[in-house]
């Protein structure tokens, strides 16, 4: 069987392609991130995704299917319970999450947790509600500058987020990270457990001028079991992460990490990594689609971000070697035309391409995201870890 020396797996964060049979159980009716983005703009220029076969896989306004797509493609349905970042990525690497991470979206965090966090950090706490990052800064940024109080908030995800002004005399990065480490320790308790604690540094001095910086840091839970990434690393293969992949897996199974300032930067980093001689996986997360456009319900911004991605995708396609494999996918949906600000439970795309391929076309829908991890494992002739899921499609990539 043909083996690939390098596999580039790119997660276009939140690029869902239509509701699943169980979407209604998650409050998501009629959702379709990609389709609804395309219906919100007057033109949509993604020629390289089109060339791979994205419009053959799923109906996209302004983008026609092509007669001979370059890639193999299919829809994947999440087997795990949930629709968040960690669940999606962990499943890609073989873990099925049976119990969703708890959220505090509607209630805020328990007073007992806040009291303990305040006591251990020595700071008063304001916020304690679900909000977008821009909203919470406009509301409480000036207050923090005056008082030094810690801004704590959450979202539709299983997260506890803390905002801190980057300038030391006001709050400072070191102090923000210290507070987040304390929060992570506290939220390991079952009744307070969240998937991630996120440090959200910002700059600016008044409402309307506050901006979050790229010094964000995620303090994630370790995966609940051994993933394909661990097995790759244990077998001497390279696992190079770009974007928030390292944070999502709490560093487990990663041999080299690259933090990104934006999704465009993430693609630029990936293009640089392509010049390296390595054997293994480059695992990329491009978060701006989700963070800047999906949650903020901005379909036009989302479409423009996809067009920027497509420009760099052309460069990537041109740099692929005969023994490279490219996989493009997503971790959940986030329909920017849907009510609220939450992720949406959707199918995600699987596009697989190598310059050495002689075939192409539609494959049968996968019943889990773990197809990715299983395919990677078979390619590098390593066993799937115990208690993992996933069926490889390597033999179908001709």
Curated annotation (Swiss-Prot):
Cofactor entry: Mn(2+)
GO molecular function: magnesium ion binding; manganese ion binding; phosphopentomutase activity
Pfam families: Metalloenzyme
Pathway the protein acts in: Carbohydrate degradation; 2-deoxy-D-ribose 1-phosphate degradation; D-glyceraldehyde 3-phosphate and acetaldehyde from 2-deoxy-alpha-D-ribose 1-phosphate: step 1/2
Binding site for Mn(2+) 1: 13, 331-332
Location in or out of the cell: Cytoplasm
Cofactor binding annotation: Binds 2 manganese ions.
GO annotation, cellular component aspect: cytosol
Protein family per UniProt: Belongs to the phosphopentomutase family.
Function of the molecule: Isomerase that catalyzes the conversion of deoxy-ribose 1-phosphate (dRib-1-P) and ribose 1-phosphate (Rib-1-P) to deoxy-ribose 5-phosphate (dRib-5-P) and ribose 5-phosphate (Rib-5-P), respectively.
NCBIfam families reported for this sequence: deoB, PRK05362.1
Name under which the protein is recorded: Phosphopentomutase
Annotated source species: Clostridium tetani (strain Massachusetts / E88)
Taxonomic placement: Bacteria, Bacillati, Bacillota, Clostridia, Eubacteriales
Gene that specifies this protein: deoB
């Amino acid at each position: 069987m043909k083996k690939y020396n390098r596999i580039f797996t790119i997660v276009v964060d939140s690029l869902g392609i239509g509701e699943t049979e169980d979407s209604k159980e998650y409050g998501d009716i009629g959702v379709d991130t990609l389709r609804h983005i395309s219906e919100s703009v007057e033109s949509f220029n993604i020629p390289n995704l089109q060339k791979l076969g994205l419009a053959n896989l799923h109906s996209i306004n302004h983008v026609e299917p092509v007669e001979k797509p370059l890639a193999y493609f299919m829809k994947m349905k999440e087997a795990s319970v949930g629709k968040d970042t960690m669940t999606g990525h962990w499943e890609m690497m073989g873990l099925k999450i049976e119990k969703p991470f708890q959220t505090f979206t509607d209630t805020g965090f328990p007073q007992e947790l806040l009291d303990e966090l305040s006591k251990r950090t020595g700071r008063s706490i304001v916020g304690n509600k679900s909000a977008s990052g821009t909203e919470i800064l406009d509301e409480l940024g000036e207050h923090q500058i005056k008082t030094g109080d810690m801004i704590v908030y959450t979202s539709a995800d299983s997260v506890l987020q803390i905002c801190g002004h980057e300038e030391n005399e006001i709050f400072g990065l070191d102090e923000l990270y210290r507070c987040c480490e304390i929060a992570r320790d506290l939220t390991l308790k079952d009744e307070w457990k969240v998937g991630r604690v996120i440090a959200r540094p910002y700059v600016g001095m008044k409402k309307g001028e506050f901006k979050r910086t790229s010094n964000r840091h995620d303090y994630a839970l370790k995966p609940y079991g051994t993933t394909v990434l661990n097995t790759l690393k244990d077998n001497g293969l390279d696992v190079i992460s770009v974007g928030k992949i390292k944070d999502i897996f709490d560093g487990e199974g990663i041999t080299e990490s690259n933090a990104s300032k934006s999704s465009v930067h993430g693609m630029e980093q990936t293009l640089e990594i392509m010049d390296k001689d390595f054997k293994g996986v480059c695992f990329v997360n491009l978060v701006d689609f989700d963070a800047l456009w999906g949650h903020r319900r901005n379909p036009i911004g989302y479409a423009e971000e996809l067009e920027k991605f497509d420009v760099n995708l052309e460069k990537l396609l041109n740099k692929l070697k005969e023994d490279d494999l490219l996989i493009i996918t997503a971790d959940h949906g986030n329909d920017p035309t849907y009510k609220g600000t939450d992720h949406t439970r959707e199918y995600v795309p699987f596009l697989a391409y190598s310059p050495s391929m002689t075939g192409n076309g539609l494959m049968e829908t996968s019943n889990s995201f773990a197809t990715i991890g299983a395919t990677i494992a078979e390619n590098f002739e390593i066993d799937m870890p115990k208690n993992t899921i996933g069926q490889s499609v390597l033999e179908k990539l001709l």
